[in-house]
Amino acid sequence: MATTKPYRVLLYYMYTTIENPEEFAAEHLEFCNSLELKGRILVAKEGINGTCSGTVEQTEKYMEAMNNDPRFDGIVFKIDEADGHAFKKMHVRPRPELVTLRLEDDINPHEITGKYLEPKDFYEAMKQEDTVIIDARNDYEFDLGHFKGAIKPDIESFRELPDWIRENKEVLEGKKILTYCTGGIRCEKFSGWLVREGYEDVSQLHGGIVTYGKDPEVQGELWDGQCYVFDERIAVPVNQKEHVIVGKDHFTGEPCERYVNCANPECNKKILCSEENEAKYLRACSHECRVSPRNRYVIQHELTEEQVAAALEQIEAGK
């Protein structure tokens, strides 16, 4: 792989048996720290789900070690070049599940999952009639970017998806179902759940959006916006042929691809907004959050009560 930037961001997962996740997590954290990697890795009895950053040399050593562990035989790393670290710290945490569905009867993707479609096949399938495309991500991920014509489930977390499907089953009945997520891990379980629910024609994008955007043949075509990623980059491009902005500023509705967290720590909602509107609205999604005594924007910028009052007055005057 030709390298032009000094750092890399790795994204990977694998459903495989890890007998003692707590012990593995502690040892793996020590190993990652010895390589000076930064990132976030989740470990469960059902496998591993990680994203981390480091120099080319550090990430090469990490991938080599993982490939040499028989538990991770066949693991696939999605690699992005970067100018620096994409994370501030290194976390390796044991979890009950790699992705939180909290099903009473869990799905094992080795036993049941939807058909895997490579990017070109997924591209062709999206253009067919009687096909529904379901985004298996959260609402704020969809709002930044999605495939043309994809359905946005009204959910704030992955575990809400099965209930949404049951409440909206008329949308799916008799249709070919395509589903996708960032790197593929959520769809492994979600597509398997759909099959178990009785849907007969269920396919998933193999390798997720990240792989689709890098595919030399499809080049991210039929994707609008950017792809939300869970690191300091926040967003990465997908469509190499055209860039259509689908994100809308929380306050004005204007095209926007800049995410911030609401300044009220009790809310912390992700909102799309310009730098100008961040300042104007004190980085708060609502009036209640603007006047919160814990508003981080107010504290960070050391705004006086008079300055906050003036900002609130200006917002009222503009309504």
From Swiss-Prot:
Signal peptide: none annotated. It catalyses: uridine(34) in tRNA + AH2 + O2 = 5-hydroxyuridine(34) in tRNA + A + H2O. Residues 127-221 form the Rhodanese domain. It is an enzyme of class 1 (oxidoreductase). SUPFAM superfamilies: Rhodanese/Cell cycle control phosphatase. GO terms for molecular function: oxidoreductase activity, acting on paired donors, with incorporation or reduction of molecular oxygen. It comes from the Bacteria. Keywords: Oxidoreductase, tRNA processing. The active site is at residue 181. Pfam families: Rhodanese, Rhodanese_C, UPF0176_N. The keyword Oxidoreductase applies. One of its GO terms (biological process) is tRNA modification. Belongs to the TrhO family. Catalyzes oxygen-dependent 5-hydroxyuridine (ho5U) modification at position 34 in tRNAs. This is tRNA uridine(34) hydroxylase. It comes from Bacillus cereus (strain ZK / E33L).
